[in-house]
């Protein structure tokens, strides 16, 4: 353990259990700020089958549901950054999420999930959350009147 209340698990989270292929994009050894394609590949490993790269290698990893990890009580925060597999992770952790109602920071992008961002946002809101994005130093509540579609990182906080 690195920190007293932090546990690391060497596995992928989803809505099913077993083994799966983790796709790792292969990139060139050099990385320049104007090489957008190479920058995109950084941190883009995924088990989401709709998000496949032209040049990648796969490794087999264990896949579990968040609900089956037997985590401690009082989970206060969950970070999800899974390149298109967000809804699957949430579906596999519904009991944990509903029981603890943690603050969640979730990266959601249409280019990864291949579905509208608002669909995932609305699914999470139905669990009893308000949805926000960060604009400079302010949390802005997502509604039909603001331009949240340019955002990627969303904060979900239990409704009052």
What are these regions (language model features)?
Residues 1-160:
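Phosphate/nucleotide-binding beta-alpha loop and adjacent structural elements of enzyme active sites
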């Amino acid at each position: 353990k690195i920190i007293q209340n932090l546990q690391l698990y060497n596995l992928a989270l989803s809505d099913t259990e077993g083994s799966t292929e983790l796709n790792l994009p292969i990139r060139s050894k050099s990385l320049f700020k104007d090489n957008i394609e190479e920058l995109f590949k950084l941190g883009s490993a995924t088990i989401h089958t709709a998000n496949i790269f032209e040049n990648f290698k796969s490794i087999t990893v264990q896949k579990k549901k968040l609900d089956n990890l037997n985590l401690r009580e009082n989970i206060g925060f969950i970070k999800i950054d899974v390149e298109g597999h967000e809804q699957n992770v949430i579906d596999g952790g519904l009991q944990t999420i509903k029981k603890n109602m943690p603050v969640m920071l979730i990266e959601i992008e249409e280019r990864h999930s291949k579905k509208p961002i608002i669909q995932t946002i609305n699914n999470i809101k139905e669990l009893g959350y308000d949805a926000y994005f960060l604009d400079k130093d302010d949390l802005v509540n997502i509604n039909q009147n603001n331009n949240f579609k340019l955002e990627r990182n969303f904060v979900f906080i239990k409704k009052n």
